[in-house]
C-alpha cells in the first residue's frame, strides 16, 4: 500500500485540501496517510478531520497520526512538508526589525531579511529530514511546500541526494488570472513559463495558438486592471514579460517600488490577496489573526453534517497520482538547474515545466531566458546563493552579505545600516538558529 507522509500536518485549510485532493483519485483511495506534527493538539484535530473525510467518502484509506517523525517516515513513498519553524514568535522579528530600519516587506517569506532568516531557521530541520529519509525511505519523493522555496530546495540538493520537488501555486494562479482578464476559457490557453520561484516568466502565452500578449498588454492599460496589479504591470512594461507572483510579492524582489511611499500606496491601494487588503506586514497580521482560530475552524468543519470537498489546483496530489497510476501530467516544479535554464547558474533552484509519470519527475530543458529576465532572476539568485552558503558553513558573514545583496534592502539602507539590522535579527532569533551558536 502506498504510504504518504504529511510533515507539519497542523494546517487546517492546506491539510484538508491536500488530503481530499489525494483521496479524490480512485487509484489513491486506499493509501496510508501518516500525519506528523510537533503540536499534539493540532495533530489530533487534523486526524479527526481526516478520518471524517475518509468515512464520509467511503474510502479505504488508512489514517495514522504521530508526533515521531521517524515513525512516520519509515517505509514512506511520498513525503509532503508544510511547516514553519518558530511560528508567529519567529515571524515577528522577520518583519518588525527590518520595518524599524525602513525595509517595508508585505510578506517577507521568500527573499529579503525575512526570507533569509526564515530559511536559516528552516535549514537544520530540512537537513534532519533528509538524513532520516536517507535511512528510512531513501527512494521516496519529497514534495516541499515550505517557503522560501528556492533557498530550501537549493539547500536540500546541496546536503542530500533525496529526490525532491518544490511546489507553488503561482503559475497556475496567474495563468488562470490572465485567461480571465482577456476573456479566454482556460482550456483554450497554452503557455511556456520558466524562471525561479515567485519570479518565473510567461515566455509564451497563447489563446488557441495565437499570441495573447497583445491582448494582455491592452487590458493592462485599463485603470481598473492596473490598480489591482501595479508592480507586475510596470515590470511587464519595462521588461516585456508577465511574472508569476502577485504584485505585493514582486514588489519585494526588485528595488523599484518599496523605497517610495507613493509607489507603496499605488501597489496597495486597490490590491487584495485572498480577499484581504494588502499593506506592509500584511501576512504577519494574518498570522496574528489566525493564531487562535485553529481549533474553532476545525470544530466548525467537524460540526457540519456534510463536508464540502472539491479538488484544488495544487500540484501535489497530481504528482502522487501520476507516479502511482502512471497517468502523465505536466506541472511547474522547483528543481535543481542541471542545464535546464542555460543562462542561470548550474545547481541553483529553477521553476520549469516538468513531465510526471511512473518514472517520476522529469524537468523540461528551457534553454536561455531573454537576457533581461535572467538578469532580474540573478539579482534574487545571488541572495539565495549566499544564504545557502551561510546555512552550510554556519558563517554569519554570508548572512550579512546575502542581505546586503538583497534588491529591496540595498535600495533603502547603507551597508552599516544593513549590518546593524542583521545583527539585531540574529539576537532576536537566536533560539531558532542553533547552527550559528
Residue ranges and their predicted role:
Residues 27-51:
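NAD(P)-binding Rossmann-fold cofactor-contacting core
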Residues 31, 87-88:
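Short glycine-rich, flexible loops that bind phosphorylated cofactors or substrates
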Residues 62-75:
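Short acidic low-complexity segments
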Residues 74, 80-81, 144:
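Redox-cofactor binding/interface segments in oxidoreductases and associated redox assembly factors
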Residues 129-202, 206:
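Internal, well-ordered domain-core segments that constitute the primary functional module
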Residues 183-437:
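Long, compositionally biased stretches enriched for glycine and/or charged residues
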Amino acid at each position: 500500500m502506498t504510504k504518504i507522509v504529511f510533515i507539519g500536518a497542523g494546517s487546517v485549510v492546506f491539510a484538508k485540501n491536500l488530503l481530499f485532493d489525494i483521496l479524490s483519485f480512485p487509484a489513491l483511495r486506499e493509501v496510508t496517510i501518516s500525519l506528523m506534527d510537533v503540536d499534539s493538539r493540532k495533530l489530533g484535530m487534523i486526524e479527526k478531520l481526516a478520518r471524517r473525510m475518509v468515512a464520509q467518502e467511503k474510502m479505504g484509506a488508512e489514517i495514522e497520526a504521530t508526533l515521531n517523525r521517524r515513525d512516520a517516515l519509515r517505509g514512506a513513498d511520498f513525503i509532503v512538508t508544510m511547516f514553519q519553524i518558530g511560528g508567529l514568535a519567529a515571524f515577528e522579528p522577520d518583519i518588525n526589525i527590518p520595518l524599524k530600519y525602513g525595509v517595508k516587506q508585505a510578506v517577507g517569506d521568500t527573499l529579503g531579511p525575512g526570507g533569509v532568516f526564515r530559511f536559516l531557521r528552516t535549514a537544520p530541520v530540512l537537513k534532519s529530514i533528509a538524513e532520516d529519509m536517507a535511512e528510512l525511505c531513501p527512494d521516496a519523493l519529497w514534495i516541499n511546500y515550505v517557503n522560501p522555496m528556492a533557498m530550501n530546495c537549493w539547500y536540500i540538493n546541496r546536503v542530500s541526494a533525496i529526490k525532491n520537488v518544490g511546489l507553488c501555486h503561482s503559475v497556475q494562479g496567474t495563468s488562470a488570472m490572465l485567461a480571465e482578464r482577456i476573456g479566454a476559457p482556460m482550456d483554450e490557453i497554452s503557455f511556456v513559463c520558466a524562471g525561479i520561484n515567485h519570479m518565473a516568466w510567461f515566455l509564451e502565452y497563447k489563446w488557441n495558438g495565437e499570441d495573447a500578449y497583445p491582448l494582455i498588454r491592452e487590458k493592462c492599460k485599463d485603470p481598473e486592471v492596473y490598480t489591482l496589479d501595479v508592480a507586475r504591470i510596470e515590470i511587464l512594461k519595462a521588461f516585456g514579460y508577465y511574472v508569476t507572483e502577485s504584485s505585493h510579492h514582486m514588489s519585494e524582489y526588485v528595488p523599484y517600488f518599496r523605497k517610495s511611499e507613493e509607489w507603496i500606496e499605488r501597489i496597495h491601494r486597490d490590491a487584495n490577496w485572498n480577499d484581504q487588503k494588502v499593506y506592509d506586514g500584511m501576512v504577519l497580521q494574518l498570522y496574528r489573526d489566525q493564531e487562535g482560530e485553529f481549533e474553532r475552524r476545525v470544530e466548525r468543519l467537524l460540526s457540519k453534517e456534510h463536508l464540502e470537498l472539491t479538488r484544488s489546483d495544487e500540484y501535489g496530489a497530481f504528482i502522487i497520482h501520476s507516479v502511482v497510476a502512471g497517468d502523465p501530467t505536466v506541472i511547474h516544479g522547483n528543481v535543481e538547474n542541471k542545464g535546464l535554464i542555460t543562462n542561470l547558474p548550474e545547481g541553483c533552484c529553477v521553476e520549469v515545466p516538468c513531465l510526471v509519470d511512473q518514472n517520476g519527475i522529469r524537468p523540461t530543458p528551457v534553454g536561455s531566458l531573454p537576457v533581461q529576465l535572467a538578469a532580474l532572476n540573478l539579482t534574487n539568485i545571488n541572495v539565495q546563493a549566499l544564504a545557502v552558503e551561510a546555512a552550510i558553513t554556519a558563517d554569519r558573514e554570508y548572512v550579512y552579505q546575502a542581505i546586503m545583496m538583497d534588491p529591496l534592502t540595498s535600495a533603502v539602507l547603507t551597508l552599516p545600516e544593513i549590518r546593524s539590522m542583521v545583527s539585531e535579527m540574529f539576537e532576536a532569533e537566536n533560539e531558532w538558529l542553533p547552527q550559528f551558536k
